[in-house]
Regions:
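Transmembrane-helix motifs of polytopic, lipid-linked glycan transferases
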Residues: 94-117
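Extracytoplasmic
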Residues: 364-500
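Short hydrophobic/aromatic helix or loop-helix immediately within or flanking a transmembrane segment
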Residues: 45-49, 64-87
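Transmembrane catalytic cores of multi-pass membrane glycosyltransferases
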Residues: 28-45, 52-70, 185-192, 197-323
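Start-transfer (signal-anchor) and selected internal transmembrane alpha helices
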Residues: 1-27
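Signature aromatic-anchored transmembrane alpha helix within multi-pass, membrane-resident enzymes
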Residues: 336-365
């Protein structure tokens, strides 16, 4: 009877924990919003649609396909869509929700091992849920993107692997890290690096060595010939548009955002060790040692002109997982020492952190619906144009539009390729980022951008020149359009026109 009662209580507790994780996941989704097709989704969502329909993008597939050669992410999502018959929009949103749930579940598992107090565990999860769109200093990354990104899924798997290592089950972490590597190799490599330091910190002889030496050593570098090849001038031109790639050009506050968390984890290690909180102390030591090592690696990689070919690897992305742990532990400490069991403190805490992040997201995507539900008619004028193009123009249509359209007021960084599902001439923002990763695209990118120089003053003769040079037969222009174009659709801001 007592055993049955104990099992029942345990099951109810597990169910309650699951419901809390799902509840915080729903809250996180509601706060951060959902914007398919923005920013990097111009690569991933476009590739998924191309996998499902190879007839799409006959003129410009290299601007997304080449960058994704090292990942299976788009193919796996496309495979799920084929297997289930669920629409692209619905499946992508479901995967985003699943990634949020897995991320918060993994954070909860970590918090349970680091903190004995249940209120601390849930406060940590609550703060992570609220702060998913927190920028990571200097890196142009968020903890979690507002669209389905390979990094979202890989990070969730890395966090789950960390929880297994903390639980003393290192072998369970290996397949998770391998899958993460197949999804996002760079983030997985950094995750593997952290797991290595965590394993060392939990290993008693290594922990004693850390305490006595308190330093980190750089591994020897293996020379690779391609690293020292002279860079393509057009590749350098694209690279120079990304100032966040250059560590030594960061502002002082970006440096503070990089070094400050490492100092905090060093302090946490010392305090937790004095208080006898052994696991928390070792975890903090692992984060500190990992951060110091990766910071030194980044300073070497980005400090010598001869190593410029390594710049697109963006070694400062190591901060991404550090910020995850910073938010998780900050929330847990807040819950342990300040929130405690006070309902009013918890209510104020949740209101402030979620309300402020929600307001920030509404300001960032002010012209779009906060959650862009599948099948819902868009209110954004650019998305209205993309929707018309997707259903009313030939699959092989080739478009030109303002090469800086992503920065246009009310556009909110939505990708034409991903949402209109048509080919376009290279743009000056997202395609430039692609060239930094794929140098061989430099000549094509530069030629197309130069041909679009002075776009705002284009007249019919300029559009006819694009048609003759590249085969472009459609354009998206501001309404009212230049005379002579055969316009098929317009709203108050934009017109979609054929080039005669």
């Amino acid at each position: 009877m007592h055993e049955y009662t104990g099992v029942t209580v345990l099951r109810r507790k597990s169910l309650f924990d699951l419901l809390l994780i799902l509840g915080f996941s729903a809250l996180a989704f509601a706060v951060m919003g959902y914007h398919p097709g923005i920013e990097d989704d111009g690569i991933y969502l476009t590739a998924i649609k191309s996998d499902l329909n190879p007839a799409l993008f006959p003129h410009d597939a290299e601007f997304f396909r080449l960058q994704l050669q090292a990942t299976l992410f788009d193919k796996w999502v496309a495979g799920l869509i084929k297997l289930t018959g669920i629409s692209v929009a619905a499946m992508v949103m479901m995967c985003q929700l699943a990634a949020i749930v897995l991320t918060l579940y993994s954070c909860w598992r970590i918090a349970r091992i680091l903190f004995a107090e249940e209120r601390a565990q849930w406060a940590g999860v609550a703060l992570v849920a609220a702060m998913l769109t927190l920028p990571v200093s200097g890196t142009a990354l968020f903890l979690f993107d507002q669209h389905l990104h390979a990094r979202n899924v890989a990070s969730a798997l890395i966090l789950l692997a960390v929880s297994w290592i903390l639980a003393g089950k290192r072998w369970q972490a290996i397949p998770l890290l391998l899958v993460a590597f197949l999804i996002h190799p760079i983030m997985a490599a950094l995750g593997i690096s952290f797991c290595f330091f965590l394993t060392l910190a939990l290993y008693e002889p290594a922990h004693l060595w850390f305490q006595s030496k308190r330093n980190a050593t750089l591994a020897g570098a293996v020379p690779l010939g391609w690293i020292f090849q002279p860079p393509n001038p057009l590749w350098r031109k694209a690279l120079d548009t990304r100032t966040y790639y250059y560590l030594y050009k960061w502002a002082w506050y970006e440096w503070l955002g990089a070094i400050g968390p490492l100092v905090l984890f060093w302090l946490l290690w010392r305090v937790a060790r004095r208080r006898g909180e052994n696991v928390l102390a070792r975890f903090a030591l692992a984060v500190f040692a990992y951060g110091v090592f990766q910071q030194l690696v980044a300073m070497v990689m980005l400090g010598f002109p001869s190593l410029v070919r390594l710049t697109p690897l963006q070694p400062m992305r190591y901060l991404h997982i550090v910020y995850f742990f910073l938010v998780l532990i900050a929330g847990a400490l807040f819950g342990k020492y300040l929130l405690k069991a006070s309902v009013w403190r918890w209510a104020a805490f949740l209101l402030v952190v979620n309300g402020s992040m929600f307001a920030a997201q509404r300001a960032e995507f002010s012209s779009s619906q906060h959650i862009e539900w599948p099948g819902r008619a868009p209110s954004n004028p650019w998305l209205q144009a993309f929707a018309w193009i997707r259903t009313n123009t030939p699959t092989d249509a080739y478009f030109a539009l303002d090469p800086r359209y992503l920065e246009a007021p009310s556009e909110d960084y939505h990708s034409f390729r991903a949402l209109a599902e048509r080919s376009q001439l290279a743009d000056a923002i997202k395609d430039t980022a692609v060239v930094t990763q794929v140098p061989e695209l430099g000549p094509v990118w530069n030629r197309q951008l130069e041909a679009q120089r002075g776009w705002k003053d284009f007249q019919l003769a300029d559009f006819e020149r694009l048609k003759a040079e590249f085969g472009v037969d459609w354009v998206v222009v501001r309404y009212q359009p230049p005379a002579g174009l055969a316009c098929q659709w317009h709203n108050d801001e934009l017109a979609v026109c054929e080039i005669p």
